[in-house]
Amino acid sequence: MKKRSLFRQLIIGLLLLLGFYLLGIFAYGWSGDWQPGPEPTALIPDQSASEKTLTDSVLTLVSWNVGYGGLGAESDFFYDDSGIWYSGSSMIRSPKNLVEKNLNGVLEFLDRNKDSVDFFLLQEADIVSDRSYNIRQYEAYQKSLPGFAADFAVNYKCDRVPVPLLEPWNAYGAVLSGLASFSRYPPAEATRHQLPGHYPMPDRMFQLDRCAALHRFPAPGGKDLVVINLHNSAYDPGDKIKAIQLPYLRDLALAEFAKGNFVVLGGDWNQCPPHFRFDTFMPGNTQGYLQGNLPPDFFPEDWTFAYDPTVPTNRKVRDPYLKGKTFETLIDFFLVSPNLKLTAVHGIDQGFQFSDHQPVMITITLL
């Protein structure tokens, strides 16, 4: 009887200890939760453009979720496998040498394309984060693109992301990350737009605060070219949060088009384009994954979704990447207004060497 009583007391004590530990985490998260307001805020330029005005009518843009340098082909990610409690056999963060390898791959890509591309829209770029060993990635991207205007819209700011919860000694740590936008021309306006919708508590305290970065460039003919860098919500069962974010983006873009402006949206939508089968690259072999589509009536029919249906842009990170085995889909693309002509679109197949996403490049003509 005494042994049973001691065992029961031990279990109760452990449960109480776990409860106090979790309560402490949530109290800390609540007190330090960064909550940007709903109003658009000006983005501070961090680098100036060498060109003074936009004079060309033919422009090339690239969008790439660079995966904070931590999700190259060799890596998996515990959150996709074990969830918030423990890491299991998956990585919480990639080894530093892999982060450096991935960053160098991104920098080489930027350097190789800087003479032919006018706009680079990057997502999941770290300023300084534990997950990428506090390597100043955004600063490195600026140095790789001299002569490009640069600004940064924060969408992930947390002093300590405590997951996996049962491994406090190995927590994800501090994160400062977001959308890095680079342009050959100086924007007349750059603003961060907080997207509506949020995760339920307590996830909300440690998740991204999704946003879009809008850039306005005076164009020939008295119009503006409006370029929007976006990254919509992931880990969103049923696309419930995205269903709130999408109308905001639609209204923002349509309002600019109604003024006669040229409008381009590009980024990681975390949804497939309308009517695009999410298992196109691995028919029937979904491995339990499900990727939703943007609604067919999301935009008027004369707007153009720009993507390359032959090249996947995203691979899942439950396991390290293996061609033909790892599930691939397409969730990174552009949307262009009817007064722009889409002249080329290319998915750039890198074998997911440097990120769990691949770049998409488009060329447009102002009509």
Predicted region positions:
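N-terminal, active-site-proximal structural segment of metallo-dependent hydrolase catalytic domains
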Residues: 2-144, 152-167, 172-176
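Metal-dependent phosphoester-hydrolase catalytic domains
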Residues: 4-9, 13, 21-49, 216, ...
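Beta-strand-turn-beta hairpins that frame and shape the catalytic cleft
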Residues: 50-61, 73, 174-175, 179-193, ...
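Active-site beta-strand/loop signature of hydrolases that rely on acidic residues for catalysis
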Residues: 60-66, 89-92, 99-134, 182, ...
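Conserved S-adenosyl-L-methionine
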Residues: 122, 150-157, 190-196, 344-348
